[in-house]
UniProtKB/Swiss-Prot annotation:
A Pfam entry, by short name: FKBP_C
HAMAP family listed in its UniProt record: Trigger_factor_Tig (MF_00303)
Region annotated Disordered, chain positions: 425-495
Name listed for the protein in its UniProt record: Trigger factor
Residues of the PPIase FKBP-type domain: 162-243
Length: 495
């Protein structure tokens, strides 16, 4: 077999592969055996039809078609390995030449990982917030716990910040109604700023069944950037009632008997959470600076697949109802156009991050132990709210084992690189990154955390439609449309 590669762009290649017929004989024999099982001829048992009789019945073209499709996966993979290509997508394959009993030539075009020049991490300096785990932080954590056990009750008073309201919204521009900014029975917590500008200010002080009109600039839709008159009507008003922080609450909300014991436990949790936040901040800022120092082209097809994957994942929550999805976006002061722009930006960032980390992992070659891989599976299962065994079955069914292995490998490579970075907090205190990312201290959460999770959360382990080198398998090559010459074509094949 001979192969050559043509670089069509920084992210796409074209392989040309020639396979002599003497190397194709095992696939031809396999084709005869396979087709013999599918053909019933008088006088022959099934599967026992001689090759010459089978060829006379089906034609030489059918035999070659089967043999070539049997051959494609292994020869393509061999060519990819020979040229050390980091293939990201399934190839487009064409049979370009067939000389019966002489050779078969095919081309395969695919997106590949571009060449990436890695920065010197030891030159990177980052600054993060100091580690603060005081009584105020413990109080805030206790309040969060109380809120989980809180109840909503209707109140008869003006709306206040943090209240929960059900509202109707409508808007007009130039006296004409704006359909995409009209909704009824929308639930909203006052003060969270998630809906249109000026709404929270308008709501404060209103009463149930009261309406108010205010002006706001629309940020999306056909009237994006135009000033609209928005009318809001409060349909219901509730406040969250928190339980008292006493021993009874401690017994209700935890395994502790007293509020003092609960606070002590929360203090430890707060400290661990603050450390995790600081580690996450270090990781994210280091990765951001490393990417700023690196410029490379992104494979467009991979980005597009990532965009589609993100959109389909969101639409599943609306049972595929794009109209309902668009209405929600409008109620949030956004639009499909803005969503598409944001999604593409997110997809590009996810693909850029993964390609960079894959290159870093190839450079550093970190070893992933079985224990580390198991811990990552358990950590990821927890993120998705699944039992480890259930999650393992799901990723096996979706062929994502390789993708999860690649996650761990990227995380370890990044952690190793972060250990060489200069880190200080905003008070000027030096922080040794090895405390978080050293081999002994390194945990699954700190090594793979949000830097790699940013990509995986957007793509469910890998960018949609993308295959890393660790997980790629040429399992669809035989299904690729192949223009194999017919029986007549093979007789007149190019000499």
């Amino acid at each position: 077999m001979k192969s050559s590669v043509e670089q069509q762009s920084a992210t796409r290649v074209k392989l040309t592969v020639e396979v002599p017929f003497d190397e194709l004989q095992p696939e031809i024999d396999q084709a005869y055996r396979s087709l013999a099982q599918q053909v019933t001829l008088p006088g022959f048992r099934k599967g026992k039809v001689p090759p010459r009789v089978l060829e006379a019945r089906l034609g030489r073209g059918a035999i070659l078609d089967q043999a070539i499709n049997n051959m494609l996966p292994s020869r393509y993979s061999q060519a990819v390995e020979e040229h050390d290509l980091k293939v990201l997508t399934q190839p487009t394959i064409d049979i370009t030449r067939l000389e019966d009993n002489e050779l078969v030539e095919f081309t395969a075009e695919a997106d590949v990982r571009p060449e990436i020049d890695l920065p010197d991490f030891s030159t990177i300096e980052v600054e993060v917030d100091p580690l603060v785990a005081d009584d105020a932080a413990v109080d805030a954590e206790l309040d969060n716990l109380r809120a989980r056990f809180g109840t909503l009750k209707a109140v008869e008073r003006p709306v206040q910040k943090d209240d929960f309201v059900s509202i109707d919204l409508s808007a007009t521009v130039g006296g004409e109604p704006v359909d995409e900014a009209t909704t009824e029975g929308l639930s909203h917590q006052v003060g969270n700023g998630e809906l249109i500008e000026g709404l929270d200010d308008a709501l404060e002080g209103m009463k149930v069944d009261e309406s108010k009109t205010f002006k706001s600039n629309l940020v999306a839709g056909d009237h994006e950037g135009e000033e609209a008159e928005v009318t809001v009507t409060v349909k219901s008003l509730k406040e969250r009632e928190l339980p008292e922080a006493d021993d009874d609450f401690a017994q209700l909300a935890s395994e502790f008997d007293t509020i003092g014991e609960l606070r002590e436990s929360l203090a430890k949790q707060v400290e661990e959470n603050k450390k995790a936040e600081q580690a996450s901040s270090i990781r994210d800022k280091v990765l951001e600076k490393a990417l700023e120092k690196t410029d490379f082209e992104l494979p467009e097809a991979v980005v597009e697949e990532q965009v589609k994957g993100q959109l389909n994942q969101l639409l599943q929550q609306f049972n595929g109802d794009e109209k309902a999805f668009d209405q929600l976006l409008a109620a949030q002061g956004s639009s499909r156009e803005q969503f598409d722009r944001d999604t593409r930006s997110s997809a590009e960032e996810a693909v850029r991050t993964q390609l960079f980390l894959d290159t870093l992992a190839d450079e550093l070659q970190p070893e992933v132990s079985q224990q580390e891989f198991t811990e990552h599976i358990m950590f990821t299962a927890q993120r998705y709210g699944m039992e480890p065994q259930q999650f393992m079955q799901a990723i096996q069914a979706s062929d994502q084992i390789g993708a999860l292995y690649a996650d761990v490998r990227r995380g370890k490579a990044l952690a190793e690189s972060i250990c060489t970075v200069s880190v200080k907090d905003t008070d000027g205190n030096e922080i040794d990154p090895k405390e978080y990312f050293g081999e002994e201290e390194n945990t699954d959460e700190t090594s793979t955390g949000s830097a790699d999770a940013e990509a995986s959360e957007n793509s469910e382990a890998t960018p949609s439609g993308t295959e890393t080198e660790e997980s790629a398998e040429f399992d669809q090559a035989a299904e690729a449309p192949v223009a194999t010459p017919t029986d007549d074509d093979s007789e007149n094949a190019e000499k």
